[in-house]
């Protein structure tokens, strides 16, 4: 291990997903970057998976939450633990990913090249369709309902192989400088699921740091593997609608609401028509419950300190 390699703490969440998480851990063992640790945060699993994972991968640092704290809450537990022990970088990594052997080294090299770079993302490909892009950078603007994911579902044919600055970094896999986290804080837990990475990206750019997409770093993603367990009962619809409204209330200037709300209403109507045509009333109900929850959720004080 070169003396110049910064220490990286890889924070991974597990929730009742032994085999998927183990596949991710096994891919990390094959990396050529060696100065790292894995902080596995179990989010209240009831299937015995945390104990089985520790037996299969005894090198991990296991933290067990009593209940499911959501993506942001679970990640924050791991991030704060790593920061207390003096890490140089934190890598938030979804458990349903497989990484290329040189992926972490590529990310660290770019992050180390410029003090204004606060966080970096890899190129993300679909696991089941490895010739298709899941993420090749992202853009976020105040009036948009969701960030624009560059290259989504396009073929990985070299078109997106240029490193670029981005305004949206996906929480699927992003490497963050520890000093930046100490300055701008951890993830906002009010979202529980979705939108926490969007807000963190916004705070990053507002603090004067850059987010960068690094195409030479590659991972493969089983997108929405965990959330699909809950898709039939409207989990995704609820948290997308709720998160959008919470984010808008917190961060979208009032002067932009006349531009944003027509898009949001059109999205709600479209989703309603789609689910109604499928006679999936649970998703319709979840969509409007999420909208209402987003309108009435108490917004927390700006305290995301470490």
Model-based region annotation:
Residues 65-85:
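Glycine-rich, basic loop-to-helix element that forms the pyrophosphate-binding segment
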Residues 87-98:
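Short beta-strand-to-loop acidic/aromatic patch adjacent to the donor-nucleotide binding site
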Residues 235-242, 253-306:
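Non-catalytic, C-terminal membrane-associated alpha-helical segments of glycosyltransferases
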Residues 182, 186-192, 198-220:
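Catalytic donor-sugar/metal-binding loop of nucleotide-sugar-dependent glycosyltransferases
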Residues 73-77, 97-98, 103-186, 190:
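Acidic/His-rich active-site region of diverse nucleotide-sugar glycosyltransferases
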Residues 26-35:
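Short, acidic, metal-binding catalytic loop of nucleotide-sugar glycosyltransferases
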Residues 47-55:
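Acidic helix N-cap motif at the loop->helix transition within catalytic regions
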Residues 36-44, 63-65:
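Short beta-strand/loop segment that forms part of the nucleotide-sugar
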